[in-house]
């Protein structure tokens, strides 16, 4: 049994071809933060005939099962990434949609300190920082970031 088959079974999901193919694409580093529409286009490009409705349904199932994490970045478009064991935060370009993951212990420590000052014990958090690429011409290069 492959690792992907085990992952699906451990999540309580039946092993189906669409689920396996979508999981394979999500494991590609170039598809780290991907929308349902972009995932659908990638599947078409590699010759997989999986409908857009199926892609949405599988991503929702994966989200419910904890296999993927859904992010609703500025602009209203959901993007998905495989759920990771390590915590990280995100920088997002408002022009091209580029997503950069980062970890910074100073930020994490400050968040815990602020929560403690207010009598809150943190269990989870999300930090999204929005801005614009310094190059200034990233809109022209939008396709380079659409599959991240």
Curated annotation (Swiss-Prot):
PANTHER family: FERRIC UPTAKE REGULATION PROTEIN, ZINC UPTAKE REGULATION PROTEIN
KW Lipid metabolism (keyword) present: no
SUPFAM superfamilies membership: Winged helix' DNA-binding domain
GO terms of molecular function: DNA-binding transcription factor activity; DNA-binding transcription repressor activity; transcription cis-regulatory region binding; zinc ion binding
Region Dimerization, residue ranges: 85-142
Subunit field text: Homodimer.
Coiled coil: none
UniProt keywords, alphabetically: Cytoplasm, DNA-binding, Iron, Metal-binding, Repressor, Transcription, Transcription regulation, Zinc
Residues that, per the record, bind Fe cation: 87, 89, 108, 125
Function: Fur acts as a repressor, employing Fe(2+) as a cofactor to bind the operator of the iron transport operon.
Binding site residues for Zn(2+): 33, 81, 90, 93, 96, 101
Organism taxonomic ancestry: Bacteria, Pseudomonadati, Pseudomonadota, Gammaproteobacteria, Enterobacterales
Protein name: Ferric uptake regulation protein
